[in-house]
Amino acid sequence: MKARGCGSGGGPGSGQPRIEHRAGPSSGPGRSASTKQNTAGASPARNAARAARVDALVKKIGFLSFGHWSSSPGSHTRSASDALLQSIDLAVAAEELGADGAYFRVHHFARQLGSPFPLLAAVGARTSRIEIGTAVIDMRYENPLYMAEDAGAADLISGGRLQLGISRGSPEQVIDGWRYFGYQPQEGQTDADMARGHAQVLLEVLRGEGFAQPNPRPMFPNPPGLLRLEPHSQGLRERIWWGAASQRTATWAAELGLNLQSSTLINNESDKPFHLQQAEQIQAFRDAWRTAGHEREPRVSVSRSIFALVDDRDRAYFGRQNQDTDQIGFIDATTQAIFGRTYAAEPDVLIQQLKEDEAIAAADTLLLTVPSQLGVDYNAHVIDSILTHVAPALGWR
């Protein structure tokens, strides 16, 4: 039986889903203006230092949808078909608005997106620039070889735009749901060990090296040597992310050369505010990355629930949701988690609040969690409000 996934890190917020993404080389208005000012009367070294500071502010901004559907009053996604088709339409709209990423959360045994690769392939076929990804797929449920084939196909359809977030997964709708998919931790293993083992197999086969002994009398002619999985998409291995809830797993991800996704909740590992704990997790990841000696620079994304109140609809939906404190609770019998606040305010207030968020500052990618049940038009408005009224003032654009 095939396996699909869910993941670590989600978002409370609006009673519906939330989002996150990174910085790229494109030169938005803030970047080009700063670069122009820096070139006059300054040394090349000083110009380079200033440009580096500007680049550090620029962020890729995408959305993260949990893909809920329900027949509750006011829901625009009343069926699985609605949720899937509107997810595609929102990705198209986000690309037209200038957003950088369309990401989807995966959950099993729930009225949410459970099988991401058909959706990712469809989004890839309908768009041309935007990154498409997951945040995250639960590797406890996954056959890593079949997953590599699905991911390779989706990546090729999109022209190499897949950003695949995977993780150990979060508490599920059912008890030990992976058992129904045919998986069971080996003796002495935890389900987290099993998930990390599946992830390591996935990373190995994504390298594209042959490992399977060919049949001497095959149905079709084989190339020489051991055979690899097909279709293989070159470069996908470098676009795998790990959704880490703790500093320990963030360090593990860095050692393996995975990018980092950190969401709207993480393990509560100190008495510090959420954004500071998350910033420390990111720093631990970057330190471990440097120690590992990887040649490329890693990417880091954080997810946030951010709503700019620019019209009466915004105030009606989110005017009372500006939670100025973090929340702490148990996500299972033993794990205490800290949930990040929801940002909902007028743009000028939001700008000041977001300047203080050290984890956002440390990330190159911001994913905005969206209330998908409110429909494509409203969610496009939510994304556009951040891109237009907030991001430029913070140097993100």
Residue spans for each PLM region:
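N-terminal beta1-alpha1-beta2 module of alpha/beta enzyme domains
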Residues: 47-130
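Hydrophobic faces of well-ordered beta-strands that scaffold small-molecule active sites
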Residues: 61-65, 102-104, 132-135, 162-166, ...
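Glycine-rich, proline-tolerant flexible connector loops at the mouths of alpha/beta enzymes
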Residues: 101-123, 264-275, 367-380
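Alpha-helix-loop-beta-strand connector modules within alpha/beta enzyme cores
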Residues: 113-137, 384-396
